[in-house]
Curated annotation (Swiss-Prot):
Keywords: Cytoplasm, Meiosis. GO terms for cellular component: cytosol. This is Meiotically up-regulated gene 177 protein. Has a role in meiosis. GO terms for biological process: meiotic cell cycle. It is found in: Cytoplasm. Its main location: cytoplasm. It comes from the Eukaryota.
Length: 105
């Protein structure tokens, strides 16, 4: 169902005091090129069991679709109009988001 996997990344979650947002940083396991996800802890789409509103920034790479399974983030190339998607899996429920790209390095 998904296109080819570009990289599997370890997840590091830190706290950005200035913006008071959780920052999720993903390092590519081959080239060490990284991108960061700024996760806004705002509840939305509770009817769809989605608990978070997400905004992400991409750096140096243009991953367009990402899939979060258990403790690994799979960076996947998207085939749909270059829209960034983050699939946050919690238990048996999958939440889909359409974040906005803030900036590129």
């Amino acid at each position: 169902m998904y296109p080819k996997i570009v990289a599997r990344c370890m997840i590091v979650i830190t706290k950005n005091r200035e913006s008071e947002r959780n920052v999720l940083i993903c390092y590519r396991n081959v080239t060490n090129v990284y991108f960061s996800l700024r996760i806004l802890l705002n509840r939305q789409n509770e009817g769809n069991n989605c608990k978070y509103k997400l905004v992400f920034s991409l750096y140096r790479v243009s991953f367009r679709r990402m899939r979060l399974n258990d403790r690994q983030l799979s960076c996947v190339e998207s085939v749909t109009n270059g829209i960034g998607l983050l699939c946050l899996k919690q238990a048996d429920q999958v939440c889909l988001f359409t974040p906005t790209v803030d900036s590129h390095l």
